[in-house]
Amino acid sequence: MKIFRHTITNTKSTKLMCSVLLLSLTYLTLTVTTASAQLRAGVAKVNITNPDIKGNITDSLFVKALVLKSQNTSAIIITVDAVAIGGIGSLKDNYLSEVRSRVKEELGIDPQNVLINASHLHGAGYNVCQDVEARTIQAVRLASQNMVPVNVGAGSGYEDRITENHILKLKNGKGWAIRHANPLPPDEEIESIGPIDPEIGILRLDKKNGETLAIVYNFTGHPYQSISEETGGYPGFASKLIEKNMSEGTIALFIQGFCGDVIPILYKDVHSVRDQEPLGIMLGMSAMDAIRNIKPVRTGDLKIITEVIKLPRRTDFAERIASMEKEQEELLRSLRSTSLNFKTFLPLYIQYNIFKEYPSYYSHRYLRERDLGRNDLKKLDEENRRHIAKYLQNIYAMEKLSRLQYNIGLAKEREIENESAGESTIDVEIQALKVGDFVLVTFPAEVSVQVGLNIKNKSPFKNTFVAGYTNGYIHYAPSIDQFGSGAYQDHNCLLGSEWQKIYEDKISEILKKL
């Protein structure tokens, strides 16, 4: 019996020990699972303003780095207040490779896991400090030295008041870009305008104590410079507003979208000083409305896929240039001799448009001539109107000629660039990054907005956003309907029209892997 009782006792102990062991293993399993899903992040920014830049500098330009690390994956998001990542502006063509190489050397992070986006800032963004590579590495280093566990949240805001489409669609089926390099067409020739992307994509990273570490926000629109000041553009003002209204030390990183044909409103306004600050404040406030409604969660997976795809180079430059030169010749032949010069045209034009019924004198003189059976003033008016119409026709022809001349020059530059490459395709790096529910896909060009809207509509992820000007620069990437339109984007492009479908299909394929 003693043996029997002892056996029972041991059996109970064994069961108890097994239960404890099972609970311990369950706890360990949960701990490991949680750890694998726990994201760590560090963020920093470094001033890259060029002190020698001309003009009145009212605020600073920055390079900002966000280092992300999960159990098996590391990634870095870098944003630069510059016009482009190589190609144009003061960031050299080897900037991307130099930064990635140093990151690999110092942190051991795969170069393909580094995403660098330029805000496409004009003005000061064309001429940042000369040691921008070193300062970029400094920002990454500082961010990596201050990594903390973070909660992750994603969402979107809405801002449709500060941008408009760059291209005017004309009644003749052509396109005309709103630019300071050329005048706008007559109002009666304009049929419609294209779309914008009002969505503000947001990634929110909070520390475990509830304080916000970083806000990544994505928006679409050219940040042109103000007329009298050199600033960070609307992204600079929006970032400043976000940082001041979040936890102390929060850093806001702006990621430029597909804004190849999206510009700020009132871009050609001649009656007021162009100022980016009101636009930035509106964007910042709209972003804050969305940020406050995002509730970060403890887990957030980190994935990044980088691929290089081959896209066809454009081959119709000669045809396009010949077509524009033919149009030039036709416009030249349309010019007519005229009695007026600008000195006589301007007062006549004003006079005959304000006082249409009696432009040459007070009405009683016209009435007196009628009583006398004469029509001298009417004949004078008819002659003056013919002169005005002829002069106006010459002006419109001159405006179109100057635009054609500029576009022909652009097309010839891109033709030379493609021919010197010596191959029919161009290698393009694209990325897809997923942080929690935040998904970002990239392209290294000034992509037309419709392409981004298409990608968002087809994505299986709710919070999918697009970044142009990322990891390189190959000029413009118009949407398929803009090829042959005659707009600025049509001529400043290295790619064949097939590029859009190839890219969109590839992105759809990559998104399925995320």
Describe each region flagged by the PLM.
Residues V32-S36:
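Signal peptide processing junction and immediate N-terminal pro/mature segment
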Residues C18-T31:
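Bacterial N-terminal signal peptides
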Residues M1-T14:
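N-terminal secretory signal peptides that target proteins for export/translocation
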Residues T7, M17-V20, G86:
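Composition-driven detection of intrinsically disordered, low-complexity segments
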Residues G284:
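Charged, flexible cofactor/metal-binding loops and thiol motifs
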Residues A37-I251, I255-I281, I291, R298-L514:
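Conserved beta-alpha junction segments in alpha/beta enzyme cores
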Residues I3-H6, T29, P111, N209:
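Residue-level detector of alpha-helix boundary/anchor positions
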